[in-house]
Amino acid sequence: MAGRPEKCFSLIRFTLLCLKMVISSKTAPEIPTIDQAYSKISNSITVEWTTVPGATSYLLTAEDGNTIIETTVANSPGTVTGLKAATLYQITIRSISASGQSQASSPKQAKTVLAAPVLEVSSPSPDSILVSWDAVYMAIGFSVSVMRANGLGRIWKENTTNTSLTFSSLDAGTLYTIKAYAWNANGIPGDDSTRNQRTSPRAPANIQVFFDSGALKASVSWTPTEGAFNYTVVASSDSSQRSCSTTLSSCSISSLQCGTEYLISVSANNDAGSSKSCSAPTLKTVACAPGRVMIQEEPPGHLSVAWSNVELGDYYVAFVKSDDGLEVHCNTSLTQCNFLSECGFTYFISVFAYNKAGQSPLGDVFNYTTAPCCPNDISPVLVSSDRVEIAWSPVRGAELYETKAIAGYSIVECNDTAPACTLSALDCDTKYNVTVYSFSEVRGSNLSCSSHFITTAPCSPEIKNISKDAFSMINVHWRSTNEGATYTVTAQGKKGLFQCSSTGETCRMGGLPCGSMFSVTAVAETQAGKSLPSYSVPLETVPCCPAGLTAAQVTQSIINVSWTAGAVAQTYAAVLESYIGQSKCHTHQNHCLLGCITCGINYTVALKAISSTGLTADCAYQSYSSSVCCPLGVKLYRLGPNGIRIYWRASRGAANYSTDLYGSKGIFTCAPHAGLSFCDITNIPCGDVYTVMVSPVAETGLKLTFCPKKIYSVTCSGSTLGMVIYRGKRNDTASPR
C-alpha cells in the first residue's frame, strides 16, 4: 500500500512532461545553426550563427567536461567569457522567444588561445633590458618586442623558446615598452603582455669639487645625464664616509672631518637602478685645530702660548683677545708665541692651523686671568653703632671682594661679588682698620691692597630715670660710655614731639601737655654718626583738669559738685572745706554729692584729677557759700474772715524768704519785707487743703526748694474762713541727685 501513491505521482509527472514537450514543439522558435566558433582572447570564445525568425535572444553554452558556462546574447556574434586558457570547449546555442526556447543546436568545438606570459623586466646596464617570464601552458614558443615608449625609433623583436631575453644597444635612461606573447603548436598566438621599463642612467661627467673651509663642507657639481631621477654623492676616507642626494646637478656634503683626505664619487639613479660611480680627484680638508695648548705667565706681565703640531698644517696663527675687546696675534711656523699681559684682565686665546684649503676650525678657546686690581676709592656709605656699609668702584678681574675689619683682637669679615659690603656685629664707638681685597677664583686674592680707618657710631645711651621738679619740668638722666658725644632726648606722643640736648648725662624739657603718654628715647651723636635710640621709657603726664566746675545745693546738708571730664583722668577727688571741717568724695563720674554741710557757711571747693597709674593733678580751688538755713516753726494762722498769716522763725544769719501756699483752688505766693518773719495772704478760699513752704532766696534770686513742707486744712464757717488745722509734713522735698 505504501508504494502505490509514489507510483501514482510518478505517472502524473511523466504525463505532464510529455504534455509540455508536445506544447513546446508546437510553439518554441527554430533551432539556430552555428556558423563558426573561435577564440581571440584566452578567457573567451566568440560564436557566429544564422539568425532565427522570432527569436528575441540566444543562450550560448560552453562545456569542457567539468564546467558549463552559459551566456545570453541579443544577436550574432556572441561571446562566452570566464573561460580557461588553452582549453577545448563544446559550444551549443538555443534561440529564445516569448513562447519559450528551442532545443540546443548541434555542438561545435573551439579552443581558447594561450594565456599571456607574466613578465619580469630590469635594466642591468645603461644600454640593455632583461625580460624574463614563467612557462605558459601549451606554449611552444614566445615572441618579444621592445620599442621606445613614445613610439619613436626602431623596434627590436625576438622569437625564442626560452623564458628570458636580453635586449642591448639601447639608449641609456630611456623609457621602453616591452610586449610578449606565446604561441601553440599550430602557431596560433595567445594573449600578449605589456610592460614599461627604463634603462639605468650613465654615470655623470665633468665632476667639480669646491671646498668651504669655514663650514667643513664640499660642494660637488656635474653635467646632468639622461634619464636620471636623482644623484648620490659620496665622500670616502679611510675612517669615515659622508654622502648627499639631490635631483639637481650639484650637491653639498657637510660635516667633513678636518685633516682628512677624501675620495669623491657621483652616481646617477632612476627607477631602473644606479649608474656606476664616477670618481673625481681627491679632496684635502683644512687641518684640525692645534691641541694641547699650554699658557704660562712667567714672569708676571708676559704670556707664553704653546701647542702641538697637527697633520696637514703648513703654519699657525695664535690670537690673544682681552675682555676689553683688544686683540693681538702672531704668525709662525713654530709651535709657540709670546705676548704681553696686564693685571685685572681675562685673556681669550685660540690657535689656528692653515694650509692651502684654508683655516682650521675653531678649537678650544682658552682663557687666562691675571690677578685682579685693588679697589682704591673705598668710602663709607652708612656708619651705625654696630654696622658699617662701604662701597667702591668695581675693578678689573675681581669676581669677589673680601673685606676685613680689625680692631685689636676683633676681626669681622664679609665676602660679596658686589662692590659693596656691610660689616655687622661691630663694637660701637670703636676705630676699625678696614681692608678690601679683590679676588678671582683663578688667581686668588690680591694681598697688596691698602687699608682704611673707620670709626663706628657711638653706643646707645641707657635712660636711668625720669623725674619731675616743682616747676613741672621733666628731668631725664642716662648712662653712656661714649667720648665727646652730644645727646638728644626725645619725648614723642600723639600730641607732639619735644626734645632737649646735652653733652653730659642729663637734660630738662618742659611744656609737655597734660593727659598724654610719651615715649622717651635718647640718641648719642659723634662725628662718626648717630647711635641707635636707647630703649624707650614711657612717660605719663598728669591728667588734664576738667573745665566748668560747679557746686549746687541739693538739700540743706548736701551739695552736688559737677565738672566736665578731663583727658586721661580715671577718678576724681572733690573736697569741700570750711573752718568747721571738710567733706570729701572719690568717684569715677563727673559729679559728686558732698554731705554734712552746714547751712549759711562759706566753703572752699577743691578738685583733683587722678589717672589710672595714680598721677594726681590739683585742678581747681574756688569758694562756695552754703544756702541760708531753712526757717523753723512754720505755722498758719487765720487772719480775718478771708486772710491767712504764715509765720516762721528765722535761722541764723539774715536772709530773704518766699512763701508759697498750694491748694486745689490755686497757688498763693507772698514775699515778706526784709527782716520780717511772717507774710500775709488775703482772699484765701476756704474748704481746701494747703501745702505751705517757706523757702530762703539766694543772692542770685534763686528760690531754694528743699525746705520742708507742711499741710494745713482751712475749713469754712459760712462764707468766711473757719478753723486752720495742721495735718503734718510732706516728704516730697528735693532728693539728692
From Swiss-Prot:
Q: Specify the domain of life of the species encoding this protein.
A: Eukaryota
**CDD domains, per this entry?**
FN3
User: What UniProt keywords are attached to this protein's entry?
Assistant: Glycoprotein, Repeat, Secreted, Signal
Q: Does the keyword field hold Secreted? A: yes
Q: Which SMART domains match?
A: FN3
Q: Which residues are glycosylated?
A: 230, 433
The keyword Cell membrane is assigned to this record: no
Any one cellular-component term (Gene Ontology): extracellular region
- Fibronectin type-III domain ranges (all copies): 28-115, 116-203, 204-288, 289-373, 374-459, 460-544, 545-633, 631-715
The stretch of residues making up the signal peptide is 1-25
Question: Could you tell me where this protein is found in the cell?
Answer: Secreted
Q: Which Pfam families match?
A: fn3 (PF00041)
Which protein is depicted?
Answer: Fibronectin type III domain-containing protein 7
Source organism of the structure: Mus musculus
Supply the source organism's classification: Eukaryota, Metazoa, Chordata, Craniata, Vertebrata
